[in-house]
Amino acid sequence: KEELEYKVINIDSNLSDQGIAEESVDIVIAAGMMNNAVNTDYSMRQIICSLVHGGIALIAEPVGENYELMLSQSFMMSRPTDAREVCNETFLKMEEWKEVFWGCGISERELVVVPSDTSPLAPLNQKLFIIRKE
């Protein structure tokens, strides 16, 4: 009988130090927290390394500056040390997200992004990044 195990993690710290071995996780669900990581590149690499082959990461995040979220969240967010610091932005743009994924070794065929740019939901500037590690 398989059991579901879940953990709350510190995304800014090494996952192996938190008891999560490389290639040991089947699924990661992260909603609205990657943009609060000190360094999104580092945190995403940690997540991808923790996934087993065939594992899935579901990452829901705003893309681009989202003034509604900035009004409340920017006061609680960590000071970034990644592309957001360089560009003085709160949230990564779509192209910056892709650079994060490509930098982690994720290929285009491993990544699905919804909603599409033509969706009625597109103006909300929220994306779900679905990654299946090969």
Q: Language model features by range: what are they?
A:
Residues 104-106, 113-134:
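Core SAM-dependent methyltransferase catalytic element
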Residues 12-17, 35-38, 64-70, 99, ...:
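Flexible loop/turn segments at secondary-structure boundaries
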Residues 2-14:
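Conserved SAM-binding strand-loop segment of SAM-dependent methyltransferases
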Residues 15-28:
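A short acidic, Gly/Pro-enriched loop at the edge of an enzyme's catalytic core
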Residues 6-9, 28-31, 59-62, 111-114, ...:
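Generic beta-strand/beta-sheet core signal
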Residues 58-104, 108-115:
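C-terminal alpha-helical "lid/dimerization" subdomain adjacent to the S-adenosyl-L-methionine
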Residues 41-56:
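A short glycine-rich, Lys/Arg-flanked "PGG" loop and its adjoining helix->strand segment in the class I
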Residues 25-40:
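A short SAM/SAH-binding and catalytic strip from SAM-dependent methyltransferases
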